[in-house]
Amino acid sequence: MKLIIAEKIKAVEQLTDKLNQAKTVIIFEYTGIPVSFFTELRSELRKSDCEMKIYTNNIMKRAAKATNYDGLISYFKGNKALVYSSTDLISPAKIIYEFSKKNSMIKIISGVIENKVASLDEINSLASLPSKEILLTMLVSGMMTPLMQLSACLCMLSKIKK
């Protein structure tokens, strides 16, 4: 009996550490999901340096309380899973959002973004942001357009003067 309690305490401590280190935490509900779907989801998450864990609701509640995320405690009823990343802010939300569009049995419930409890709307808006590479491309093209127009004007001026 004491061994089981010690294992649960260790699980709470490990989850508390993960939550403290995470930039983004997503809580989602799942029902009737086949193992193959979870395997595909975990594989996709690993590619983006994200992790998914399923704990008992009691362990998740205790870890949320230990990390001062009391706003999450009410969500831990039924089948819930956690996805988190300590390196990327957008990937966990984006991946779970995309998978929830593929399978209606996955529903994003809530989460934590940079140590702040986030609503479903905040997570969905985070998930709809373009990737970092696309944002950088948009920035560079926005900066290059005026330069290209200036270059074209200077070229026309030089042709007119000749």
UniProtKB/Swiss-Prot annotation:
One of its GO terms (biological process) is translation. InterPro entries: Ribosomal_uL10, Ribosomal_uL10-like_sf, Ribosomal_uL10_bac, Ribosomal_uL10_bac_type. Signal peptide: none annotated. GO terms for molecular function: large ribosomal subunit rRNA binding. Keywords: Ribonucleoprotein, Ribosomal protein, RNA-binding, rRNA-binding. It comes from the Bacteria. CDD domains: Ribosomal_L10 (cd05797). GO terms for cellular component: ribonucleoprotein complex; ribosome. PANTHER family: 39S RIBOSOMAL PROTEIN L10, MITOCHONDRIAL (PTHR11560). NCBIfam families: PRK00099.1-1 (NF000955). Belongs to the universal ribosomal protein uL10 family. Part of the ribosomal stalk of the 50S ribosomal subunit. The N-terminus interacts with L11 and the large rRNA to form the base of the stalk. The C-terminus forms an elongated spine to which L12 dimers bind in a sequential fashion forming a multimeric L10(L12)X complex. Forms part of the ribosomal stalk, playing a central role in the interaction of the ribosome with GTP-bound translation factors. This is Large ribosomal subunit protein uL10. The lineage of its organism: Bacteria, Bacillati, Mycoplasmatota, Mollicutes, Acholeplasmatales. The gene is rplJ.
